[in-house]
From Swiss-Prot:
It holds the Pfam family Ribosomal_L34. GO terms for cellular component: ribonucleoprotein complex; ribosome. One of its GO terms (biological process) is translation. This is Large ribosomal subunit protein bL34. Gene3D superfamilies: 1.10.287.3980. InterPro entries: Ribosomal_bL34, Ribosomal_bL34_CS.
Length: 44
């Protein structure tokens, strides 16, 4: 039997998507830190 370790897109977006990050102050801090660092992708 196969394991369910594929990961679900909905869960991933809900927890670490761009809009999820924008929702909280700490999430916005994460985004600004990633911008400062020059990350190509800000969120998942």
């Amino acid at each position: 039997m196969k394991r369910t370790l594929g990961g679900t897109t909905r869960k991933r977006q809900k927890t670490s998507g761009f809009r999820a990050r924008m929702r909280t102050a700490s999430g916005r801090r994460v985004l600004s830190a990633r911008r400062r660092r020059g990350r190509h992708r800000l969120a998942v």
